[in-house]
C-alpha cells in the first residue's frame, strides 16, 4: 500500500518499530513488556466484544463472524490470537518489516490473517468497513490523534465498536512508563515513549466525540507486583482502555 501525503504516521516512530524485526515474537526480548500485557489485552477485547455483539463467551471461537481491523498490528501479537478466536482479521502497519514478521509467523502457525503494509487512512480511502477497529498502544505514536481517530472511525460499521488503549499523561505515568520502564528496569528501549504524546482519558474521550463516537467503557490496566502480572482495574493513571460506539448506533436487538 502506498503512503498518503496526509498520513497520521510519524516516520521516526515507524522506523523505530520497523527495526525490531523478528524480536516481536521473542517473549524475553525487547517486546517482553508487550508479551506481558498481551493476555490482559486479549481478555479485555474478547469480553467487550462478546458483550457488545451478544456472542457466546464459552465458545472456542467467540469472535466468529466479526471483521476486525488491528491498526498498528506490529508483528501480529494481537491479530493472530484474535483470528484463532474466529475473527476475520485484517492487520495494518506502516512498517514493512513488521508485516513480514507478522505474515511469516501466521503462515508458520497456520493462522489466517490478512496483513497489509500501509496506513489506516489508505484503508479508509479504499472504503473498507469493519465491525471492530482496534488501536492498542498506537495513539501515543501517531502525529495527529484527532485525524487518526476520525479516519479510523470512518471504517466502523454503525453497530460496531472501536477500542483504544494508550498511556495517561500523569506524573505517575512519567515515573513508571518512562523513567521506570525505560531507564531503571529497562523493560523497553529508551525513547520508546514521549510523555508529551501521552493523552488523558478526558482528552481521548473528547477526540473520540469529535470523531463521532461516544464512550461506553473506560478501564485501567495495572501491574500487580505481588502476583507479578497485569490485570484490569479502575486505576487509569498509567495504562487504560477506552471503548467507543458510533454516537448514532442502533441496537443489536
From Swiss-Prot:
Q: Which domain of life is it from?
A: Bacteria
- Which pathway does it operate in? Cofactor biosynthesis; ubiquinone biosynthesis
Q: List the disulfide bonds.
A: none
Q: Which reaction does it catalyse?
A: a 3-demethylubiquinol + S-adenosyl-L-methionine = a ubiquinol + S-adenosyl-L-homocysteine + H(+); a 3-(all-trans-polyprenyl)benzene-1,2-diol + S-adenosyl-L-methionine = a 2-methoxy-6-(all-trans-polyprenyl)phenol + S-adenosyl-L-homocysteine + H(+)
UniProt: S-adenosyl-L-methionine binding residues: 41, 72, 93, 136
GO BP annotations, alphabetical order: methylation
Give the top-level enzyme category. transferase
EC identifiers of the protein: 2.1.1.222, 2.1.1.64
Give the record's keywords alphabetically: Methyltransferase, S-adenosyl-L-methionine, Transferase, Ubiquinone biosynthesis
Note the InterPro entries from the entry: SAM-dependent_MTases_sf, UbiG_MeTrfase
Which Pfam family, giving just one, matches this sequence?
Methyltransf_23
Q: Which GO terms describe its molecular function?
A: 2-polyprenyl-6-hydroxyphenol methylase activity; 3-demethylubiquinol 3-O-methyltransferase activity; polyprenyldihydroxybenzoate methyltransferase activity
- Hey, which family's this protein in? Belongs to the methyltransferase superfamily. UbiG/COQ3 family.
What PANTHER family does the database record attribute to this sequence? Answer: METHYLTRANSFERASE, UBIQUINONE BIOSYNTHESIS O-METHYLTRANSFERASE, MITOCHONDRIAL
NCBIfam families, from UniProt? UbiG
Summarizing the function annotation, the protein's role is: O-methyltransferase that catalyzes the 2 O-methylation steps in the ubiquinone biosynthetic pathway.
**Protein's UniProt name:** Ubiquinone biosynthesis O-methyltransferase
What would be the name of the gene that encodes this protein? Answer: ubiG
Amino acid at each position: 500500500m502506498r503512503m498518503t501525503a496526509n498520513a497520521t504516521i510519524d516516520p521516526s516512530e515507524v522506523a523505530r518499530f520497523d527495526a525490531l524485526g523478528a524480536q516481536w515474537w521473542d517473549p524475553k526480548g525487547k517486546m517482553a513488556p508487550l508479551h506481558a500485557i498481551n493476555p490482559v489485552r486479549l481478555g479485555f477485547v474478547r469480553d467487550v466484544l462478546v458483550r457488545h455483539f451478544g456472542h457466546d463467551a464459552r465458545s472456542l471461537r467467540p469472535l466468529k463472524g466479526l471483521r476486525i481491523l488491528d491498526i498498528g498490528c506490529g508483528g501480529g501479537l494481537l491479530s493472530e490470537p484474535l483470528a484463532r478466536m474466529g475473527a476475520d482479521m485484517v492487520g495494518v502497519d506502516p512498517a514493512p518489516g513488521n508485516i513480514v514478521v507478522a505474515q511469516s509467523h501466521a503462515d508458520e502457525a497456520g493462522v489466517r490473517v490478512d496483513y497489509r503494509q500501509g496506513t489506516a487512512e489508505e484503508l479508509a480511502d479504499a472504503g473498507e468497513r469493519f465491525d471492530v477497529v482496534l488501536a492498542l498502544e498506537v495513539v501515543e505514536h501517531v502525529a495527529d490523534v484527532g485525524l487518526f481517530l476520525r479516519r479510523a472511525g470512518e471504517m466502523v460499521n454503525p453497530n460496531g465498536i472501536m477500542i483504544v488503549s494508550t498511556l495517561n499523561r500523569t506524573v505517575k505515568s512519567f515515573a513508571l512508563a518512562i523513567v521506570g520502564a525505560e531507564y531503571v528496569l529497562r523493560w523497553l528501549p529508551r525513547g520508546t515513549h514521549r510523555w508529551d504524546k501521552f493523552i488523558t482519558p478526558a482528552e481521548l474521550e473528547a477526540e473520540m466525540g469529535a470523531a463521532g463516537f461516544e464512550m461506553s467503557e473506560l478501564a485501567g490496566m495495572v501491574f500487580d507486583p505481588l502476583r507479578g502480572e497485569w490485570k484490569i482495574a479502575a486505576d487509569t493513571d498509567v495504562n487504560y482502555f477506552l471503548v467507543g460506539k458510533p454516537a448514532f448506533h442502533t441496537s443489536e436487538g
